[in-house]
Amino acid sequence: MLILTRRVGETLMIGDEVTVTVLGVKGNQVRIGVNAPKEVSVHREEIYQRIQAEKTQQTSY
């Protein structure tokens, strides 16, 4: 795992088309902004896991 340190307003690049920007830090929460092409899905981990579980349930019927 790559670990990076960024300050508010700083950005990191993932490939050529995805940017992640730190928008703010308040207590133990970090607000980030993600810019990605429409064909790239961006989800919080818990939402992604729910989507995958639903796909698995649909294919098992």
Curated annotation (Swiss-Prot):
It is found in: Cytoplasm. Its main location: cytoplasm. GO terms for cellular component: cytosol. SUPFAM superfamilies: CsrA-like. Gene3D superfamilies: Translational regulator CsrA (2.60.40.4380). This is Translational regulator CsrA. A key translational regulator that binds mRNA to regulate translation initiation and/or mRNA stability. Mediates global changes in gene expression, shifting from rapid growth to stress survival by linking envelope stress, the stringent response and the catabolite repression systems. Usually binds in the 5'-UTR; binding at or near the Shine-Dalgarno sequence prevents ribosome-binding, repressing translation, binding elsewhere in the 5'-UTR can activate translation and/or stabilize the mRNA. Its function is antagonized by small RNA(s). Homodimer; the beta-strands of each monomer intercalate to form a hydrophobic core, while the alpha-helices form wings that extend away from the core. Belongs to the CsrA/RsmA family. GO terms for biological process: mRNA catabolic process; negative regulation of translational initiation; positive regulation of translational initiation; regulation of carbohydrate metabolic process. It holds the Pfam family CsrA. Coiled coil: none annotated. Keywords: Activator, Cytoplasm, Repressor, RNA-binding, Translation regulation. PANTHER family: CARBON STORAGE REGULATOR (PTHR34984:SF1). InterPro entries: CsrA, CsrA_sf. It comes from the Bacteria. It comes from Erwinia tasmaniensis (strain DSM 17950 / CFBP 7177 / CIP 109463 / NCPPB 4357 / Et1/99). GO terms for molecular function: mRNA 5'-UTR binding.
